[in-house]
Amino acid sequence: MLLFQATSLLALLCFTVRAFPFMEEEGSASFAQNVLHSRSFPVSHHGAFMDLPLFRQNRRKISQNFILHSDPREHMDEEALRRKLVWESAIRRDKMRSQPDQVLPIGQDALKRSRCHALPFIQNVFRKNCFPVRLPNKFCFGQCNSFYVPGWPAGLSQPCTSCAPSRSRRISLPLRCRSGHLAWQEVELVEECECETRYDRNTVEPAGSGEDYLPVS
């Protein structure tokens, strides 16, 4: 009886060694090294491991919930990105001073155009204790070339150009207030914009001109 049990145990041991040949000393060390260094399993074991029901279910959830998000600023050139950052900084500063919030939309195509021009937006016209009114309007946006000329006459201040309305009109807009009466608010409607050269607060000249002084070209 003891001899039969020993023979059965020896046969079982031989079968185990044949069934798992990769558990030899060299193969076992290689397998452990792969695990410690976070390498992938061999193809045969990796496929069987990932085909288990638990991993199939989790893999399906990951594939459904995983969405790639790309930053739109990655597709903008350096100059357009710089203008967008300056514009966003100006909007944040103005947002702290004005109420209700005023949104000035500006797209990538407008950022790539450097010259001053008019862009459409919806203006919030408001007054204290009155209901605001949303009015289609335009705002001026773009770059203007400023310059400094040595020898400029002492009586004239140095010019500075800015993007400003070149054609606009003013209207009176009625606002309905909480007390029941109407309040009239004057609003400027901008139609076109261009670069203007400013010498002081009260003097505005077309861009590139100077009174009694012509730079040598």
Curated annotation (Swiss-Prot):
CTCK domain segment(s): 116-196
Q: Which PANTHER family match?
A: DAN DOMAIN FAMILY MEMBER 5
* Subunit field text: Interacts with nr1-A.
Family, according to the entry, reads as follows: Belongs to the DAN family.
What are the GO cellular component annotations? Answer: extracellular space
Q: Which Pfam families does the protein's record reference?
A: DAN
Q: Which GO terms describe its biological process?
A: detection of nodal flow; determination of heart left/right asymmetry; determination of left/right symmetry; left/right axis specification; negative regulation of nodal signaling pathway; paraxial mesoderm development; sequestering of BMP in extracellular matrix; signal transduction involved in regulation of gene expression
Q: Where is the signal peptide?
A: 1-19
What is this protein's name? DAN domain family member 5
Please give the positions of the paired cysteines in each disulfide bond.
116-163, 130-177, 140-193, 144-195
Q: State the function annotated in the UniProt record.
A: Plays an important role in regulating the left-right axis by blocking a tgfb1 cascade in the right posterior paraxial mesoderm. Functions as an inhibitor of bmp, tgfb1, nodal, activin and wnt signaling in the ectoderm. May inhibit mesodermal signals, probably through an inhibition of nodal/activin pathways. Seems to regulate cell fate specification and competence before the onset of neural induction.
Q: Where in the cell is it found?
A: Secreted
Q: Which gene encodes it?
A: dand5
Q: Which domain of life is it from?
A: Eukaryota
Output the InterPro entries linked to this UniProt entry: Cerberus, Cys_knot_C, Cystine-knot_cytokine, DAN
GO MF: morphogen activity
